[in-house]
């Protein structure tokens, strides 16, 4: 199951990582469930705004930045290419991170995973509860905006927990293959839970995909 999880993560990344290949317009991925499907844990208004407004904004700004970057490349304008890097990183990361995030959630989520992934979690963290506690602490502890992640370290062959600031993508920042991402930007929970991030973590574990 761990192999399937890693391979699945790579497939999820492929469309979003088009920023590294041939220039093409990126499109907003459809959610595999309705906006209201995660209620009462995450309400429909948050899901709609998060997906159709916030993710869409990263996507649109990424397309604009890439178009400008291609123009700068064609002109040989190195100064403009360098100046566009922050926008490409921020908006590209926002698109990649959210594309993964949506697939990590499920109306039928919550509880322990099964098979090889659970065994790997027990091996690397002691138990599922210890893993959950550690990822929760790392996610709650992110200063400002960012993400908490479970990733796979290909070199060491083990699972690792990491945090990334803002929209920095996990693989581009740490080299870890992202398996599970928790968005701790306030737009992910403020309308429902105000600024109480720990309550958001309690809620989101109830809809995190377990298969």
From Swiss-Prot:
It holds the Pfam family Sod_Fe_N. Binds 1 Mn(2+) ion per subunit. Nitrated under oxidative stress. Nitration coupled with oxidation inhibits the catalytic activity. It is found in: Mitochondrion matrix. The lineage of its organism: Eukaryota, Metazoa, Chordata, Craniata, Vertebrata. The gene is SOD2. GO terms for cellular component: mitochondrial matrix. The modification N6-succinyllysine is found at residues 68, 75, 122, 130. The modification N6-acetyllysine is found at residues 68, 75, 114, 122, 130, 202. Homotetramer. Destroys superoxide anion radicals which are normally produced within the cells and which are toxic to biological systems. One of its GO terms (biological process) is regulation of transcription by RNA polymerase II. Mn(2+) binds at residues 50, 98, 183, 187. Keywords: Acetylation, Manganese, Metal-binding, Mitochondrion, Nitration, Oxidoreductase, Transit peptide, Ubl conjugation. It is an enzyme of class 1 (oxidoreductase). This is Superoxide dismutase [Mn], mitochondrial. The modification 3'-nitrotyrosine is found at residue 58. One of its GO terms (molecular function) is manganese ion binding. Belongs to the iron/manganese superoxide dismutase family. It catalyses: 2 superoxide + 2 H(+) = H2O2 + O2. Its cofactor is Mn(2+). Its EC number is 1.15.1.1. Residues 1-24 form a transit peptide.
């Amino acid at each position: 199951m761990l192999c399937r999880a890693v391979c699945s993560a790579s497939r999820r990344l492929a469309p979003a990582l088009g920023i590294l290949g041939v220039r093409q317009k990126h499109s907003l991925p459809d959610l595999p469930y309705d906006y209201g499907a995660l209620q009462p844990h995450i309400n429909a208004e948050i899901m709609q705004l998060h997906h159709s407004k916030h993710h869409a904004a990263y996507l649109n700004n990424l397309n604009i930045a890439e178009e400008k970057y291609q123009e700068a490349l064609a002109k040989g304008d190195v100064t403009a290419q360098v100046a566009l890097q922050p926008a490409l990183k921020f908006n590209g990361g926002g698109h990649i991170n959210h594309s993964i995030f949506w697939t990590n959630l499920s109306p039928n989520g919550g509880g322990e995973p099964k098979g090889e992934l659970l065994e790997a979690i027990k091996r690397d963290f002691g138990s599922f509860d210890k893993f959950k506690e550690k990822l929760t602490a790392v996610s709650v502890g992110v200063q400002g905006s960012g993400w908490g992640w479970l990733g796979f370290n290909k070199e060491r062959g083990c699972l690792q927990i990491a945090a990334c600031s803002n929209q920095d993508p996990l693989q581009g920042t740490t080299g870890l293959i992202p398996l599970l991402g928790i968005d701790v930007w306030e737009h992910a929970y403020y309308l429902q839970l105000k600024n109480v991030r720990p309550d958001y973590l309690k809620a989101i574990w109830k809809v995190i995909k377990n298969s």
